[in-house]
Amino acid sequence: MSVDQDVVDEAYQYYAEDKRQISDKARKFIEFIDPILRKYSKLFRYYQNFAKFTLEYYYKLFYPFLEKLPENVVEDLKRQIINEIMSNPNQSIRDVLAKAVQKEAQRIEEQLQRRPQRAKQQPQKTKTSEVANQRVSRSAENQGKRGNEEKQQQKTPGKTEEASGAEQESGEEGNQQEESGEEQEGVKGSRSKQREEQEEEVSESEGKQSEESGESESEEGQSSEETQLSSSGEGNQQEEGKGGEGEGAETEEGGRRGEAESEQEEGEETGNGQESSGEAQNGGESGESEGEITESESASEEQTGSKGKSGQQGEEGQQQSGSEGEEGAEQEESGEEGNQQEGVGKQKKRSSRGQESEAGEEPGSAPEETQLSSGEEEAGQESGGETGSEQGFGEEGEQGQESETTGKQKGKKREATESGGGAESESEEGQSPEETQEGGEGGAETEEGGQGSEAEGTAAEGEVGQPSEQGVSSSTGSGQRSEGSEASEEQNAGESGEGSESEGAESIAGEQTGSSSESAGSEQLGSQQGELSLEEGGRGYAHGDEDLLSSPQEINSILQTLSQLRDTVQQLRNYDFYSNAIDERTFDDQNVSEHRKEKEIENLYDTANNVQKLLKDLNVSEGEQNKILQELVTQYSLRRLLGNIATKYKGLLDFVRNKGESEVESRHGSGKGPSSTMGDDLSRLFIKEYAKLSNPIQQKMFLLDYLNGALSIHKSEEKKQGDFLFVIDSSGSMEGNKIATALAIPLVTYKKYKGKRNILVETFSDEPSPIYNIKNIANVLGSMKFGGTNIGSAVLYALKNIDKPDSDYDRKLRESLRKTRTLILLTDGEDEIPDDIAREINSLKKKNKVELLCYGIDLGERGLKTLKEICDEVYAVGSNNFGNIVLKRLVH
């Protein structure tokens, strides 16, 4: 059941200049509010009145906001309102609206908070679809290259050692890593060896880049730049990164690189045959995930840069580090080893993530970074992994020494941990894909500063590695996971060892790249991935677990609109001082003090002073407000009435209690006690109607019902206003038409009142005749005498019988005389009334509360002046129309 159109028209009559223009808006609003009205109106007697009021009051309150909200949000808001009403139907609609809007805003805010996680879980759908496609193609190419590189690596494992020069240790490590990679390939797959061989080849070709990549990867264990470098040059850089990690281990363990190589070899052999200590885990991971990495090098390159590619990167990094310089590479590798060692435990924790990422969770870790890094890594491989590794390591070279010291210290720790799984390289490899990307992008730029960038990365790892590993892993480690889930993943990472390292490095890289730099940008990027994907990938606001709007701007707009609506509704709380409402139970309770009763009625008086505020809430025009105020406050004296209640409430309360509780029930149709009626007579208003003034919602109802005459009032008792006594002049001058008209007047009056009031008739001339009921018209006619005119004696006789009826009259006539309150004199004669008779007449009138109406038929000024001495009202009428004049006065 919808609201009728006439209700709509009435609801908007105050401000609808053209009803046709507003009809569409009105209908839309009614469709929104009608289900709410039908639920809430059960508490009210008249749905139509409540609908009018609600539409009147909330149209401008709600509609401007409804226009801004999507339809599904409007539907949710409607459900919230109805749920609030059904949960507590006794609360005011103001509270209902405030709570419903608040809950809807909170629900959207919660979904907005959950959205970044969802965005991280499915980032490739929104941002990196192209990159993913490129990765697939590049991964195929890289696989082909790796096949060749593996063969070359098998042929030239010693060349890497020779190319390393003083970094022969790293070269040996590269060979060992290659061998260990082969072993891992044997155990886990040939992919890690292929990557190692590719890394060695790339490292030989890139030389310094491999060192930088190794350093970057070692730093990647700590810094996101290294992971980015390794990932950006996955074909070269990732392999180099892993090689760098391996070199980091090698440099520390044997001439920092040679040692790292030996350790990596041992780590590979002991740590699942991984390439390096860092690669031991990474190698294991790479061995496990190399299949995945080779399949999707871009995705795996990001994490394989921290995982499977770490083996190849370790070899390449070793070879490149060998070409770059034993010292810089060794320092970088030592820093990397320290970082790797630091990242060992962390990477172990993250290894679970890394494995997950390797298994396809790589996009989950840092989808944007992995995609970008993979794209950049592929580009770096195509352009030459050297550039990626070189750029990535350029900045690290400065901090390489510092990171070396820290890396060495950490490397010692990691050596112990490397035997358990060599998570160091994984931490390096776990660096964020942004680092690999950045490394791939800036590889050529930092070729010269490859060692510096590596050192810088290691320094970042040494400085930020530990905290960033934890924080970043949680923030960006999985890219989708929350901090808590990431922490749990880190714990699980210790078990999986390999996968989490890549994610851990990615997360570390995220923290280090949080400031948009390689070391700081990834953190912000990781944290912003959800927002970025939200901007690009959302498909609009949806219910339940579905995605939100396509952009945070739209969501913020909705939240802002709901906030404005919530504030608007809550502004009604300014009327909370009305809460001390007059409560009928308070006055029925004998234990309530008189002071409290008086105080509550004073609150009612205060409401009258705020009528103007209430009218403003109705959104009526200023002219209409003034009109209503004038009617309520001035003409009907609402304020004075409430003031009188405050001072004389006892009489009112007695009146209400005398009527009984059933009287109040009668307004709800109980049928008990005296019936009630609808009207605007405030003197007979039920006290519960006054209680409406305590609530801002019901205040409007009170005003609307008052204007429409729909207030519940006591049905007045049918009090008889008294009988009529006609004193008719029957002198000779009244003969003819005058006397006939004069006798017809009481007959018509009797017929009008249908016996509810007795009509008595007395005729007079020189003397008054007996008084008869008009029903005995024959006796009236028989008593008529046509003679002179003695007005004074006739009126005095009638008043004396009203005061004390003659005993000769029957009982009914005497009772009727006692109830007579109106005396009507019809005469056309002029007479002098003595003063003593005039005084007695006036005295009896006052005593018996009798009203004397005198009609002078064709009388002159002198005759009218005589009548004014005794009459309350004197009318000069003509003989042709006096009948109608008298009847109009008496009947209407």
Curated annotation (Swiss-Prot):
Pfam families: VWA. Residues 143-162, 185-196, 536-546 have a biased composition (Basic and acidic residues). SMART domains: VWA. Residues 553-620 form a coiled coil. Residues 169-184, 212-223, 287-300, 324-336, 425-448 have a biased composition (Acidic residues). Residues 129-142, 467-481, 512-531 have a biased composition (Polar residues). Residues 723-892 form the VWFA domain. Residues 109-548 are annotated as: Disordered. InterPro entries: VWF_A (IPR002035), vWFA_dom_sf (IPR036465). Keywords: Coiled coil. Residues 224-238, 271-283, 301-323, 453-466 have a biased composition (Low complexity). This is Putative VWFA domain-containing protein ORF892.
